[in-house]
Amino acid sequence: MPNIFKILLIVLLAVVSFRLSASTGDKKTANDGSGNNSSAGIGTKIKRIVTAGLLFTSLATGGAEAIGRSNAQGGNAAGLVPSHVTNRSMAPPPPPVQFEMGANRLEKMRAHLRELAEKMPVNESKRLSPSGPDPHHH
């Protein structure tokens, strides 16, 4: 059972990180002179968090257990040492606030992606260009 959870989580994170990297595409180096490239910074931050999550989740031996303890980014969270061996006093510190924010943002994005997937009919699963006209209207 934990393996199924682990695989699902990895796939989900991969999808989210792919969507993120696609959405920030050419904005990474864009700078209009007034230093307004902060959006790229936020995107890369989230991407880093996602990548770290992917890395630790794929390394974790007890994936679901590590997720349940929500310390997938802590010191020994890679699951290389089983939790029953680890000393309780060596528990990793609570995650920083920034990670919490990133997690919340990811949750929102996942919910949004789920809604989009539900709304999209099967026969229109081909990608439409976001700004282009809808082919069915012409």
UniProtKB/Swiss-Prot annotation:
A motif (CLE) lies at residues 127-138. Keywords: Apoplast, Differentiation, Glycoprotein, Host cytoplasm, Secreted, Signal. Highly expressed exclusively within the dorsal esophageal gland cell during syncytium formation in host plants (at protein level). The keyword NAD does not apply. The keyword Thylakoid does not apply. GO terms for biological process: cell differentiation. Glycans are attached at N37, N87, N123. Residues 23-90 are annotated as: Required for secretion from the host cytoplasm to the host apoplasm. This is CLAVATA3/ESR (CLE)-related protein 2.
